[in-house]
């Protein structure tokens, strides 16, 4: 089992979280003190790593405020392809959605090392992209990441396709959150909660979308 104290996860996404909670007038200094992190250092080098233990404490701190119950959703919505460093820029150069998703699968460990991605095709010849935890995470942290990744996935796919194209489906293992109505505002994707037997996310895309350029 991987040691939770070893820095593995790029800090860039959690810096975005700090921006979000600061905008809600929540003290970020108390968070930094609790996690023993130097924000200035991480802002200067967003590819630096934090440990799973720090991430879990980070999420616990953020979610102890009731107003932050939609924080994972807002984090996902704030993440664009350019947020993923070099991998994101490489995705923008792909010829088709299928090519982009294969690139995501290949380099997902660079985006979020605590999760893994895989692709297969179902009997209807639809592409299914599965994203599952690679590490043992506390339930609160796990569900937070599943929601944030699912929303970011929708956001990123919509950067690559035209809004008038056919819709696609995103299945999640987590129950529908209290702010579930916000998901209805996200275009093109249809979200299905409590729909997987194992923790994670499954994206299903038709052939017509896969060939979109």
Regions found by a protein language model. Give the residues of each.
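N-terminal low-complexity or simple alpha-helical regulatory segments
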Residues: 1-127
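Alpha-helical bundle regulatory/interaction domains
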Residues: 97-213
